[in-house]
Amino acid sequence: MPIFYGTEVTSRLMLGTAQYPSPAILADAFRRSDAGIATVSVRREAGGDQAGQDFWGLIRDLGVAVLPNTAGCYSVREAVTTAQMARELFDTNWIKLEVIGHTDTLQPDPFGLVEAAAQLAEDGFEVFPYCTEDLVLCERLVEVGCKVLMPWGAPIGTGLGLNNIYGLRSLRAHFPDTPLVVDAGLGLPSHATQAMELGYDAVLLNTAVSKAGDPAAMAHAFALAVEAGALAAGADPMDARDMAAPSTPVFGKAML
């Protein structure tokens, strides 16, 4: 199982907590997913109202690790401040760092992301950066102290799957010892299987489950898909070929 900043997690599936039809459905989806980590919006908890307290109680009862995020932050200052709030609220140094650069695509701001990651790492945070598959950006993030990388598969909430297989495969080859998590854009269990087959350590998703007609069933489907992909990656899959190759022996074939 993946090891993030010295902590071994119980599952390769990480699940977000937003946009579920009800708290009961959220809890059921988590149970069916066997997810080991729940991502939680800091802004949702910062208000301190009863609904927020009830939600936090629900997450605690699930018995999963909590990864707070800085979703919705568009500047370094905003992201760093939100991360500091998260450490106070959740008593953890883990932070999923998001610094958004474009409103339409929700694409990460690479410059702000590196700057914020450097500040947070220096302050003792264990940063999980939401990034693209850009190799140079990921090198900079590792240089400033990130020991996990979370490249997107596609823009948040699109469900398009893995838009750049080449880039994701290259990233895996370049960082063989760094935990890599495909974050964002997954819509189907087959997308998660594909990420695992590329050798990624985990996947993080939210909308694909929360917006499904049956979130609990979809969560279970993703759990099975992640398991299948990880098993396949560890089984040394055959190499793809451009030309056909017979699978049955020709020795002893009758000569007509």
Curated annotation (Swiss-Prot):
Binding site for 1-deoxy-D-xylulose 5-phosphate: G157, A184, G185, N206, T207
GO cellular component, as recorded: cytoplasm
Gene Ontology process terms (BP): thiamine diphosphate biosynthetic process
Entry annotated with the keyword Cytoplasm: yes
Pfam families hit by this protein: ThiG
Catalytic activity: [ThiS sulfur-carrier protein]-C-terminal-Gly-aminoethanethioate + 2-iminoacetate + 1-deoxy-D-xylulose 5-phosphate = [ThiS sulfur-carrier protein]-C-terminal Gly-Gly + 2-[(2R,5Z)-2-carboxy-4-methylthiazol-5(2H)-ylidene]ethyl phosphate + 2 H2O + H(+)
Gene Ontology molecular-function annotations: thiazole synthase activity
Entry similarity comment: Belongs to the ThiG family.
Protein name: Thiazole synthase
UniProt gene name: thiG
